[in-house]
Amino acid sequence: MSGQMFWGKKEDGKRKRSFQESYETPKVQKCVRKRRPALNVQGQPLPPQRSLEMMSKDQLMSVLMEVMRQHPEVGSTFQAKVSSYQFASEKYQQLLKGKVEQLYSNIPYNRSYDNTNLDDYAFVRMKPYITELLNCLVDCALDNLPPRKSDLHESLKFLESCTQLVLDLPRFESGSNNYYYDKCLEQISHLWCSLIEQISKDIHMVMNTNMEEWITKLNAYNERSNGLLTSAVTLFKSLASDGDLLGDQQNEMESPAYVAGPGLLLESNPSYLMHNKYSM
């Protein structure tokens, strides 16, 4: 009896141990993370190409002008590259139109833009826009003269539009405040004389240009400018007279009785070429 009880207790102990072992909580292995190198990424400016794509026209112009001031050799290289470009007449007109609009927008509110009696206060306010417009106009006019432009008819039309633009600008009560306008008209007169000089060297241009029409236009502009374009009018009249003489001699050349001479040379007029840019 005692032996049975002994063995029974033994078996009960084994059962308890096996039961406990079967239901023991499994050991959880700790997950150790490997340390990664820290990512130290910092912002950086756009490269030049992207910056150029993002910049406005004014920003780009400001940066470019500053670079050329600091490095004159860059300006020389830039000028050499750009001088080979040919722009359409509409581009010049669009540029000048923007300058004119800036000038008109700075006329004081108590004055109308078509008023020819603007006061001193208006002049002080408008002066930087006047000088910017007139300098831009002369730059554009020079770029439309030979040899930059080979079409003399186009040069005539553009120079006429420049002349009319200056004459249409609002004037001031004080004559001294109109100095920049008058000085610019004097320079435009030199440009007219230079262009007429070029026309006089082209026989076909002389023969195919309506001189009387251009003389009439220039006379009207000269009256509005108080005689500042007189030299251009005089030179155009001289060219018209030479053109009439040339036409008579051309008819003689076409007649059967004409005997060819040493060759016809159109007498050159005094040179009015402007060598320096107009500065305010």
From Swiss-Prot:
Residues 1-27 are annotated as: Disordered. The keyword Transport applies. GO terms for biological process: chromosome segregation; nuclear protein quality control by the ubiquitin-proteasome system; proteasome localization; protein transport. Keywords: Cytoplasm, Nucleus, Protein transport, Transport. The keyword Protein transport applies. One of its GO terms (cellular component) is nuclear membrane. GO terms for molecular function: proteasome binding. Gene3D superfamilies: Tethering factor for nuclear proteasome Cut8/Sts1 (1.20.58.1590). Belongs to the cut8/STS1 family. Binds the proteasome. This is Tethering factor for nuclear proteasome STS1. It comes from Candida glabrata (strain ATCC 2001 / BCRC 20586 / JCM 3761 / NBRC 0622 / NRRL Y-65 / CBS 138). The lineage of its organism: Eukaryota, Fungi, Dikarya, Ascomycota, Saccharomycotina.
